[in-house]
UniProtKB/Swiss-Prot annotation:
GO terms for molecular function: 3-deoxy-manno-octulosonate cytidylyltransferase activity. It comes from Glaesserella parasuis serovar 5 (strain SH0165). Disulfide bonds: none annotated. It is found in: Cytoplasm. CDD domains: CMP-KDO-Synthetase (cd02517). The gene is kdsB. This is 3-deoxy-manno-octulosonate cytidylyltransferase. SUPFAM superfamilies: Nucleotide-diphospho-sugar transferases.
Amino acid sequence: MSFTVIIPARYSSTRLPHKPLLDIAGKPMIQHVWEKAQQSGATRVIVATDHPEIEQVVTRFGGEVCLTSDKHNSGTERLAEVIEKMAIADDEIIVNIQGDEPLIPPLIVAQVAENLDKHQVNMATLAVKLTTREELFNPNVVKTLTDKNGMALYFSRATIPFGRDYFPQCDDAFVQQQNYLRHIGIYAYRAGFVKQYVAWEPTALEQLESLEQLRALWYGEKIHLDLAKEAPQVGVDTAEDLERVRQILNILCSQ
């Protein structure tokens, strides 16, 4: 099976300016993400960026990079530009990894590509089981649920499904006994579908929830969803996240 990883890497970030270039254990963050993608068995790994400085850094460490517009509203739009510029075949599997996930397990990068390859759908993603009450009611944790065939029914920042007879008194033990799922933001697409996806008008649901994947469900597409074989560790959204990741990678790199 052939698949291509595309890593969108935006230069601007409100909370962490120049985030992809921040140093972690002696390397820029984007290099750690690129190395994890390389370890997944991908046929090709492309960094998609809107800034020449990131382009130069990726070129220096030997990565393939595509300079894209800085006008995109989402990472998926950036993917579509790369697919068009690089003339990637419509049937190629594309895995989208965020550029702020330096601890992404290579195992699940390969897993989401394999899941798409095995199912007659245009999009696949992963989830892990929720284990705490705090996560269950946290709007920053995206919840999801599937039908009997492993197809996503919905994604929400709200608590789904809602246990009418158990909330809000439930505890961690209750959550662990149920099948509540936390969505992981890693996707596999068929390249031709990405071009269709960005051509669709944004929907009220995706705008209300601030969840772009709801566009696919709104337009009638199936999204395959499976439990990740390995739970990813923290991504880098804040300065606190950055320090945690630095501590983890400093330890790993010193072993």
